[in-house]
Curated annotation (Swiss-Prot):
<feature type="topological domain" description="Cytoplasmic">
    <location>
        <begin position="38"/>
        <end position="231"/>
    </location>
</feature>
<feature type="topological domain" description="Cytoplasmic">
    <location>
        <begin position="416"/>
        <end position="487"/>
    </location>
</feature>
<comment type="function">
    <text>GDP-Man:Man(3)GlcNAc(2)-PP-Dol alpha-1,2-mannosyltransferase that operates in the biosynthetic pathway of dolichol-linked oligosaccharides, the glycan precursors employed in protein asparagine (N)-glycosylation. The assembly of dolichol-linked oligosaccharides begins on the cytosolic side of the endoplasmic reticulum membrane and finishes in its lumen. The sequential addition of sugars to dolichol pyrophosphate produces dolichol-linked oligosaccharides containing fourteen sugars, including two GlcNAcs, nine mannoses and three glucoses.</text>
</comment>
<dbReference type="Pfam" id="PF00534">
    <property type="entry name" value="Glycos_transf_1"/>
</dbReference>
<keyword id="KW-1133">Transmembrane helix</keyword>
<keyword id="KW-0256">Endoplasmic reticulum</keyword>
<feature type="intramembrane region" description="Helical">
    <location>
        <begin position="232"/>
        <end position="252"/>
    </location>
</feature>
<keyword id="KW-0328">Glycosyltransferase</keyword>
<dbReference type="InterPro" id="IPR031814">
    <property type="entry name" value="ALG11_N"/>
</dbReference>
<keyword id="KW-0472">Membrane</keyword>
<dbReference type="GO" id="GO:0006488">
    <property type="term" value="P:dolichol-linked oligosaccharide biosynthetic process"/>
</dbReference>
<keyword id="KW-0812">Transmembrane</keyword>
<comment type="pathway">
    <text>Protein modification; protein glycosylation.</text>
</comment>
<dbReference type="GO" id="GO:0004377">
    <property type="term" value="F:GDP-Man:Man3GlcNAc2-PP-Dol alpha-1,2-mannosyltransferase activity"/>
</dbReference>
<dbReference type="GO" id="GO:0005789">
    <property type="term" value="C:endoplasmic reticulum membrane"/>
</dbReference>
<feature type="topological domain" description="Cytoplasmic">
    <location>
        <begin position="253"/>
        <end position="394"/>
    </location>
</feature>
<dbReference type="InterPro" id="IPR001296">
    <property type="entry name" value="Glyco_trans_1"/>
</dbReference>
Length: 487
């Protein structure tokens, strides 16, 4: 009887609270809607105040790229500069803006860096908006819940960008999808994005589900079933939110078949999504004479890629150490050259750790950090093997450059390299794939044991196959895909 009375009392309490809670919820929703409307009106007023009129009397469109690390030297930055160059050729009267966090360099230094590293010069001016809060998107800022922290940090950074310059067309060229709804619904912009790599993928969920330890799944989590289950729930919830913010984009461009499949799974916008292979400066490498590799005394193995954890440079060093132990290479002179860009102190520390690893293994490794394009080309022209070890690389511009330069590519057996790049050309071999220390060492050993004539045949096939990744192909496809933003 007492239990029934207690239950009745609880029901009366809940009934009494229902109306006040309902009123409070409605009031909160109205406040949020009002805040959104006021914020949007304020942003639109700022936009009208900064309007520039062209010679034809029409308002100039402002096209903005969100690329906080535009002064880095990776493939993503090459996409940025080639995309800008192609739009400037087509839409000459527009105003072009880059949101960047590279405060330690001047506009002139950034442009000179793009010319030196990528051999790209813009035909029209570009305005740089320097952002103060880039630290909020640094992985080191979030020891735990890194994906969520960086994504929310990008919203704050995006808000800073939006308040400093309100564009007509906004293009996220670096993978900060959480900024898309901000610029679309608050900024009133047409929004597009070029996706190099999904922030989260089905493969990442599989890694956690199977309790495998990788660079993005710490051993203490993979070894604990409870923590693995909690992380899996976190990843699934994040994937749902990521799918919604990505679907806000009016135009979606992805860089490979692998990325295309994952973005369709998550964003579910097939009618707005297209594959635009990234621009590779194939033409620049075509003057390298493939026959010069015939009778070389020292074989160099070259790797191109930013010094980020996912590039897995330790695998390259360990595989090279395993190669040197093979009897077939005892009489050969071999050296490993790691070429890449450092974005911050974290990357520089990583290079120091790699140097320490090579020293511990007692192997000769040369590190070339943030080198100019001319030096990069020289190393590629002298290399026998081009090495790549990133698991599920979205594409791999460095791989294409190696193939165009005449190196024999040895790439990771996954992602873009497997599906798009290191594939047979006219039924002929263009390179090799591997996925472990042993398989990399075995593949390098096999390549070095080939005759110069056999290596030349593979080089020629590879060079012919990469014509589809040229700057010209990228410009045509990028302009066609982004055209809806300008209509």
């Amino acid at each position: 009887m007492a239990g029934i009375l207690c239950l009745c009392g609880m029901m009366r309490l809940l009934t009494a609270l229902f109306i006040p809670v309902l009123i409070a919820s409605i009031g909160l929703c109205l406040v949020l809607v009002l805040l959104f409307i006021c914020t949007r009106l304020w942003i639109q007023r700022k936009k009208k105040q900064s309007v520039e009129i062209g010679k034809d009397g029409k308002k100039k469109r402002v096209v903005a790229f969100f690329h906080p690390y535009c002064n880095a030297g990776g493939g993503g930055e090459r996409v940025l500069w080639c995309a800008l160059r192609s739009l400037q050729k087509r839409y000459k009267d527009a105003i072009y803006v880059i949101y960047t966090g590279d405060k330690d360099v001047s506009e002139e230094q950034i442009l000179n860096g793009a010319a030196a590293r990528f051999n790209i010069k813009l035909s029209h001016p570009v305005k740089f908006i320097f952002l103060e809060k880039r630290g909020l998107v640094e992985a080191s800022f979030y020891p735990r819940f890194t994906l969520l922290g960086q994504s929310l940090g990008s919203v704050v950074l995006g808000w800073e960008a939006l308040t400093k310059c309100v564009p007509d067309i906004y293009i996220d060229s670096m993978g900060y999808a959480f900024t898309l709804p901000l610029f679309k619904y608050v900024g009133g912009c047409q929004v597009g994005c070029y996706v190099h790599y999904p922030t989260i993928s089905m493969d990442m969920l599989s890694v956690v589900r199977s309790q495998n330890a990788r660079f993005n799944n710490a051993a203490f989590i993979s070894n604990n079933p409870v923590l693995s289950r909690l992380k899996l729930i976190y990843y699934y919830l994040f994937a749902v939110i990521y799918g919604w913010v990505g679907s806000c984009s009016d135009v979606i461009m992805v860089n490979s078949t692998w990325t295309f499949a994952h973005i369709l799974d998550l964003w579910k916008c097939s009618e707005r999504t297209s594959i635009v292979y990234p621009p590779c400066d194939v033409q620049t490498f075509l003057d390298i004479n493939l026959n010069q590799h015939k009778d070389i005394e020292e074989h160099s193995i070259v790797s191109i890629g930013q010094f980020r954890p996912e590039k897995d440079h330790p695998l390259q060093i360990c595989a090279f150490a395993a190669l040197l132990k093979k009897k077939t290479t005892e009489k050969l002179k071999l050296k490993l050259i790691l070429i890449g860009g450092c974005r911050n102190n974290e990357d520089e520390l990583r290079v120091s750790e790699l140097k320490k690893l090579s020293s511990e293994l007692g192997i000769p490794v040369e590190f070339k950090v943030n080198i100019p394009f001319a030096e990069l080309k020289k190393h590629l022209s002298e290399a026998t093997i081009g090495l790549h070890t990133m698991w599920n690389e979205h594409f791999g511009i460095g791989i294409v450059e190696c193939m165009a330069a005449g190196t024999i590519i040895l790439a990771h057996n996954s992602g873009g390299p497997k599906l798009d790049i290191v594939v047979p050309y006219e039924e002929h071999e263009t390179g090799f794939l591997a996925d472990s220390v042993e398989s990399y060492a075995a593949a390098m050993d096999y390549i070095l044991c080939l005759t110069p004539e056999q290596r030349l045949t593979i080089r020629q096939n590879a060079r012919r196959s990469v014509a589809r990744f040229s700057d010209q192909e990228f410009e045509a496809n990028f302009l066609a895909s982004s055209e809806p933003l300008f209509m």
